[in-house]
């Protein structure tokens, strides 16, 4: 076990996801998707505060103007810092009856991307939606069962995107305006106890840190998809990572306890908690939504 690994939030989420470090505030935000909650951790004193939203909260980004852009089950909305829901910018592209938003983030050009997962998970019905600063929405990709692992390389040359139940990691080349090209298969993960690719983030060296759901670890992958390092965790169900701290060398990791039996939770009691560990390579500051 990594000697610097700590549990920094012991109050568990049902499905903790989408950790986002605010450089401006020096705090960590994350979502409890199924509870519709947006949490905020101040690591200086360990305090946690929460905004309760009216629907499941798949993912979110921070805004230049303050507040958030949030992907709820029914669509993408603006949200102020006090939790007041504002304008709806886009509907769920795959329909709220059979899907919800899952993973997403703001790209280096200040646009918000959010992917959906198909319910039930019997087809590749998930899509990836982008909302720009003028609040125009466009479907950018599809043909996935669970849209996940979206991250943009620090040189702005690539977008990585995983499909968790299908055990695959893709990448898209990006042009100078951030428009994606043809999808490429970067890595197919072995089926078994090693886990499935969930949420992720890039470090400043261009390596991709991927939470391995049901595998109890985080992998650091080279730009061509080779495993360089791994961090073992006290839960089998990590969901996503984010770089934070003043030097962006603290790796925060969210996790899940959704649908776990009493026996599983007895074996893994910290499931749903937030963890942090120090790493050698800093991450990248999370961009802000320009709209």
From Swiss-Prot:
Keyword Hydrolase: yes
InterPro entries: 6-blade_b-propeller_TolB-like, SGL, SMP-30
Binding-site residues, a divalent metal cation: 17, 148, 198
Molecular function (Gene Ontology), one example: gluconolactonase activity
Induction note: Is highly up-regulated during growth on sulfoquinovose, compared to growth on glucose or succinate (at protein level).
SUPFAM superfamilies xrefs: Calcium-dependent phosphotriesterase (SSF63829)
Cofactor: a divalent metal cation
EC number: 3.1.1.99
Keywords: Hydrolase, Metal-binding
Protein origin, superkingdom: Bacteria
Cofactor notes: Binds 1 divalent metal cation per subunit.
One Pfam family of this chain: SGL
UniProt entry tagged with the keyword Metal-binding: yes
Single biological process term from Gene Ontology: L-ascorbic acid biosynthetic process
List of catalytic residues: 198 (proton donor/acceptor)
Family affiliation: Belongs to the SMP-30/CGR1 family.
Role description: Catalyzes the hydrolysis of 6-deoxy-6-sulfo-D-glucono-1,5-lactone to form 6-deoxy-6-sulfo-D-gluconate. Is involved in a degradation pathway of sulfoquinovose (SQ) that allows P.putida SQ1 to use SQ as the sole carbon and energy source for growth.
Name of the protein described by the UniProt record: 6-deoxy-6-sulfogluconolactonase
Lineage: Bacteria, Pseudomonadati, Pseudomonadota, Gammaproteobacteria, Pseudomonadales
């Amino acid at each position: 076990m990594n000697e610097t690994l700590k549990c920094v939030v012991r109050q568990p989420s049902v499905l903790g996801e989408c950790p986002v470090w605010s450089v401006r505030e020096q705090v960590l935000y994350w979502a409890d998707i199924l509870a519709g909650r947006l949490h905020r951790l101040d690591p200086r004193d360990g305090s946690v505060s929460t905004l309760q939203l009216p629907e499941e909260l798949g993912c979110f980004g921070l805004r230049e103007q303050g507040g958030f852009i949030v992907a709820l089950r029914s669509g993408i909305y603006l949200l102020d810092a006090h939790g007041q829901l504002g304008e709806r910018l886009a509907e769920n592209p795959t329909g709220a009856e059979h899907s919800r938003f899952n993973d997403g983030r703001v790209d280096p050009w200040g646009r918000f991307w959010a992917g959906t997962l198909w319910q039930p998970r019997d087809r590749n019905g998930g899509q990836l939606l982008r909302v720009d600063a003028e609040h125009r929405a466009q479907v950018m990709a599809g043909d996935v069962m669970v849209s996940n692992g979206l991250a943009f390389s620090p040189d702005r040359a690539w977008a990585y995107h995983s499909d968790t139940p299908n055990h695959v990691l893709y990448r898209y080349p990006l042009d100078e305006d951030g428009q994606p090209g043809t999808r490429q298969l970067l890595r197919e993960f072995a089926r078994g106890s090693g886990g499935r690719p969930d949420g992720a983030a890039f470090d400043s060296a261009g390596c991709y840190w991927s939470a391995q759901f049901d595998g109890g670890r985080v992998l650091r992958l080279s730009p061509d998809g080779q495993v360089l390092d791994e961090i073992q965790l006290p839960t089998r169900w990590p969901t996503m990572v984010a770089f934070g701290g003043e030097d962006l060398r603290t790796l925060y990791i969210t996790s899940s306890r959704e649908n776990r039996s009493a026996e599983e939770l007895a074996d893994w009691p910290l499931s749903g908690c937030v963890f942090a560990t120090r790493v050698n390579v800093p991450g990248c500051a999370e961009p802000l939504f320009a709209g």
